[in-house]
A protein has these predicted regions:
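Bacterial N-terminal signal peptides that target proteins for export
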Residues: 1-9
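Bacterial N-terminal signal peptides
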Residues: 9-18
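Sec/Tat signal peptide C-region and signal peptidase I cleavage site
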Residues: 20-24
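Charge-rich (acidic/polar
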Residues: 25-227
């Protein structure tokens, strides 16, 4: 299945179109078309909420410092949107479908300076532990959730196995904080989970069997990470 990695702006625009269509089909008066300014308000509200959630985890007591961190994170979200729009425009000009696979190389190349500048700005104000919390929240705590899942699903993991799993998941997180949306972040983590599975299979484990056994025991739970 292909991962369609649309920007948040495009997703919101599509939602607006669906509302318009539903209104027309119901026979009710059509809602006015969402303007670019309307979409910008919705987008700003979305990233403001995300940023607020991150700030809550940091326990910053200095309002001035909190405001600076707020502005850094907001600016990063906007920079990622601008990057995504440029990548999508380039793919469209080249006649390519906007998928994670097609975006991957461009994403890595164009994300590097944004990534480095973002973390450098945070490092001036925040401790390493606080920066870890920012990364964790920007990637929906996927490192801890996925690590715990592997420990629960794959029997007989050694300390070395667990260390390797954590190492690869943190690499995934480092790349995923630059993801433009949740599906893109998930696709990045999936790439690293594939590496984890290959590593474990090469070190005496059978991840395919482990996942099947887990799924059989938890048919309706849906707690196992994607293979």
């Amino acid at each position: 299945m292909k991962n369609h990695c649309l920007s948040l702006t495009v997703i919101l625009a599509a939602a607006a179109m669906l509302i318009q269509t539903a209104s027309a089909q119901s026979g009710l008066p059509s809602l006015p078309a969402a303007t670019k300014a309307d979409m910008e308000v919705v987008y700003t509200t979305a990233i403001e909420n995300r940023t607020t959630d991150i700030l809550k985890l940091l326990d910053l007591t200095d309002p001035a410092k909190s405001n600076v961190v707020h502005d850094i994170i907001m600016a990063q979200y906007r920079a990622l949107r601008t990057r995504d729009e440029a990548i999508d425009a380039r793919l469209k000009a080249d006649g390519k479908e906007i998928t994670f696979t097609n975006r991957a190389d461009l994403l890595l190349a164009q994300s590097k300076p944004l990534h480095e500048q973002f973390l450098a700005k945070l490092a001036v104000i925040l401790t390493p532990e606080q920066i870890e919390k920012v990364k964790t929240q920007m990637t929906y705590n996927k490192v801890a959730v996925t690590y715990d899942a592997y420990c629960a699903i794959v029997p007989g993991l050694t300390d070395a196995d667990k260390a390797k799993i954590l190492e690869l998941l943190k690499q995934a997180r480092e790349e995923a904080i630059d993801g433009g949306n949740a599906p893109e972040k998930s696709a990045i983590f999936q790439k690293y989970k594939d590496q984890i599975n290959s590593y474990l299979d090469a070190h005496g484990h059978d991840t395919t069997k482990a996942f099947k056994d887990w799924e059989a025991k938890n048919a309706t739970a849906g707690t196992a990470p994607a293979r």
